[in-house]
Amino acid sequence: AQGAYIHNLSPFWDHYWKNGENDKLGWRLDYNMKHRGDVYATHGLGPVAQALDIHRGDRMETLVAMDTKSVVGKELVEKRTGEECKEFRNGDHTTTMIRTANGKVIEIQHNVMTPQPYNRLYQLTGTKGFANKYPVEGYALDADQLSASGVQPKVDDLNSHGFLPETEMEALVEKYQHPILKKYGEMAKEVGGHGGMDFVMDSRLVYCLQNGLPLDMDVYDLAEWCCLAELGELSMDNGCAAVAFPDFTRGEWNVVKGYKHAYATPDRKSVV
């Protein structure tokens, strides 16, 4: 599985540099200057961790991180200070590899410095197929695998060497559209906010709180996703050595079986 936060922040760095004691946004470039590792890991890791049932039947066990040297980061600081930046800790590109207890591998990338199209990857590679969200959405399945999913291929030579044709992909997406998107998807597009994502997440938060349900993310998610920064820094500062993940669940990572969204009643699952 792969996830990433690749977002060229060139238009925003003037706002992300400290411009006084009361500057609320100015922490970011300074923080990158002082810290190695994936310092914005939640964007890439969160959805991947949920897809792989992390602490719901599996756990992240070992991490190895590597980064490029800083070129753009140093230039950004020098441009704003007029002085030489002798050390900028965060590399222009950071890659973190994680192995889980059940033998899965996760790759997470972080790059906010170099010119690239916006990308969060979200790639899942399984034994029966492949799914990719960024930079281009696509799914790769053999004809028999697509048929087994309930969608009949309209071409004779369908195989997993390329993405599904548009007709088959649309049919697959429609058949398996998530109930949360069925309810909030169109409204989210109208309201906006990061393409509607903000609205969907806020709506789920309100729904869970109103109905006394477990939230879609819990405190263990928070700890697991955020510790990637410190563990990656520890790995790279020690020659890109393997670093063990703490078990924040204290041995309970295999109690819950699979990631699930909570609903007030079973019949509400189809509409909420």
What residue spans do the PLM features occupy?
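Short, acidic/polar N-cap/turn motifs at the starts of alpha helices
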Residues: M60, H93-T95, N119-L121
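Predominantly a Rossmann-like dinucleotide-binding segment in NAD(P)-dependent oxidoreductases
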Residues: A1-F88
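A short catalytic or substrate-binding loop motif that flags glycine-/basic-rich loops and adjacent residues
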Residues: T42-H43, E87-D92, T100-A101, P115-Q116
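Short, solvent-exposed loop/turn segments at secondary-structure junctions
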Residues: I6-N8, T68-V71, V112-P115, G129-F130, ...
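Active-site beta-strand termini and strand-to-loop segments that position acidic
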Residues: T96-N102, G126
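C-terminal helical cap and adjacent loop that interface with cofactors, partners, or active-site loops
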Residues: A49, P115-T127, N132-P135, L141-V272
